[in-house]
Amino acid sequence: ECTKGGCTNKNGYIVHDKHVGDIQNRDTLDPPDLDYEKDVGVTVSGGTLSQRLVSTWNGKKVVGSRLYIVDEADEKYQLFTFVGKEFTYTVDMSQIQCGINAALYTVEMPAAGKTPGGVKYGYGYCDANCVDGDCCMEFDIQEASNKAIVYTTHSCQSQTSGCDTSGCGYNPYRDSGDKAFWGTTINVNQPVTIVTQFIGSGSSLTEVKRLCVQGGKTFPPAKSLTDSYCNANDYRSLRTMGASMARGHVVVFSLWDSNGMSWMDGGNAGPCTSYNIESLESSQPNLKVTWSNVKYGEIDSPY
């Protein structure tokens, strides 16, 4: 947690979602507990978190993982109120190829999770696509491979319904025609620090700015998210997202793959022209994304 004067370490936990691969509601199994490294390919060391592409649990292939930050008491999901704050992390995307999505995002999940498994077994997930049947507001700080990156706001007409599944996002390749930014200007073979600034106060969010820092240099993408950029004057406005963030969002780390990822890094969104995740999963199961140095606090805190 950071101020302009510096940062102090905060302790917490990571928990996996209730679903592991195709195995649902893991708390119903015997035993229900995970060996995170072996079963879901997740390793934590100090302030560093890695997610591996392929693992095996209960004899079944598990692709990727979805993880939530839990508070220091290990009782509730940690809630973050982002308006007027900055969220920063370093990520190593060097192994994340076409068709793989290394995502870091926030959703308005209930802090106590949901019954019957609660926080302990990763219950309570929701997002703007209503993936598990539960809808809520979602802010994608990063969805990316090493070919393209996008950040996107997804507001909803209410806290639990009517979500804007497409959202309003910014991808330098797609939206500025800057095909060199993510890959050349930013060397994706080296770790990069990504800074997201949520401009506003209280529950009033007016702009979301993005900076990338690498090799001692700061690279601002050409555009930030505003109501003007998004052409949003209804529920899709940043005002709606700001109110949601003021209630508190849970931070999610996700790694998944799909042959239908052209919306993110193919077509007009990126240079990928074909996808074969089955080949990737079999030939490079140990592909991983590594997140580190996660920071949250005052805008313009030390990167």
Report the location of each language-model feature.
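A long-range scaffold signal marking pre-active-site subdomains of enzyme folds
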Residues: 1-137, 142-146, 251, 281-303
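Aromatic sugar-binding interfaces of carbohydrate-active proteins
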Residues: 2, 110-114, 120-125, 131-133, ...
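Secreted/processed peptides and extracellular or luminal domains of membrane proteins
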Residues: 8, 13-14, 162, 169, ...
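Arginine residue identity/basic-tract feature
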Residues: 26, 52, 66, 174, ...
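Short, solvent-exposed loop/turn elements at domain surfaces
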Residues: 58-62, 148-150, 260-264
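Short, polar loop/linker segments at the starts of domains and inter-domain junctions
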Residues: 63-69, 153-156, 265-278
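Glycine-aromatic-enriched beta-strand/loop faces of beta-sandwich-type recognition domains
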Residues: 68-72, 118-188, 230-235
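Exposed beta-sheet edge/beta-hairpin loop segments within beta-rich domains
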Residues: 77-83, 165-190, 240-244, 281-283, ...
